[in-house]
């Protein structure tokens, strides 16, 4: 199987009872169900990401504050070590949150695999803050992909849970024609 040095993932986190991703479960605090299939954190953790990650690899993975702890567990299970927030997206239009603070941001965490993964970074002046209005539900700004390539160069890369085909990227997901079989 092809090995990637960049893995960019936007898991379809479930806001239901996390023991499963049953769409018939009640959502938290009246949140609407998303217009796509969701996955429980255990299902996300069990994806065979180790089989597609190169010896030295950098993972960019989206999470919300609600799923932050689960995302850190996913990172570890996939064989990576959390390093920092890669990108913070200020949606400039909405404030979400079901428990305490109302947040209009999402985080894209950066994690590494391999003792030389840090050598994959080619530029050190890429801004982490993305300020762009939200469009389609859960669609992340295209600018993030551009900044990842600017940061790391034109190396083998894949977007997991992709919604669109992007030039230079392999993709996997149920909303696109996938370049690999991951399940």
Predicted feature descriptions by range:
Residues 1-183:
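Class I S-adenosyl-L-methionine-dependent methyltransferase catalytic core
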